Curated annotation (Swiss-Prot):
Pfam families: Ribosomal_S7. GO terms for biological process: translation. This is Small ribosomal subunit protein uS7m. One of the primary rRNA binding proteins, it binds directly to the small rRNA where it nucleates assembly of the head domain of the small subunit. It is found in: Mitochondrion. Belongs to the universal ribosomal protein uS7 family. It comes from Reclinomonas americana. GO terms for cellular component: mitochondrion; small ribosomal subunit. The keyword Ribosomal protein applies. One of its GO terms (molecular function) is structural constituent of ribosome.
């Protein structure tokens, strides 16, 4: 058995969403999907994009990208144990995790809304995130407040 480390090539053929050619939208559809029913998730997203176009008369992909950008957190707190006590240490978040947290928060808050159909809930939540309001933005703000209040422990970041 060889002790040599194997170097694996990253997957270079990245899939893209067929209508808007957007990787983040493809990730959003995949996170929205239940039980492998991708066509249902795609219909939900495209119908909510139609609703967004009716309500705001702005290109829905611009609304979507701005909603994701407004919802992405920059810092998070991680619990680190030093000398028998736990500290909440603020740390920067890698960009792929920022996007995934934003997607997860938007979908989660859309599912908790009270509108009748998921299309309405998703479109309203995307519009709210586009306008810097809504539950997903509240989650981002609370995460940033937590990091700001624990800024005194930022020097523990190296551990």
């Amino acid at each position: 058995m060889s002790r040599k480390k194997r170097i694996y090539k990253k997957n270079t053929n990245i899939l893209q969403e067929p209508v808007f050619n957007d990787n983040v939208l493809l990730k959003f559809i995949n996170c929205l999907m239940f039980d492998g029913k991708k066509s249902v998730a795609e219909k939900l997203v495209y119908n909510s994009f139609r609703e967004i176009r009716k309500e705001t008369s702005v290109d829905p992909i611009i609304v979507f990208n701005d909603a994701i950008r407004n919802t992405t957190p920059v810092v998070q707190v991680k619990s680190i144990r030093i000398a028998g006590s736990n500290y909440q240490v603020p740390m920067e978040i890698p960009t792929h995790r920022q996007i995934m947290l934003a997607i997860k928060w938007i979908i989660e808050s859309a599912r908790k809304r009270t509108e009748k159909t998921m299309v309405e809930r998703l479109s309203k939540e995307l519009i709210d995130a586009y306008k810097n309001s809504g539950k997903a933005i509240d989650k981002k703000i609370s995460m940033h407040k937590m990091a700001e209040s624990n800024r005194a422990y930022a020097h523990y970041r190296w551990q």
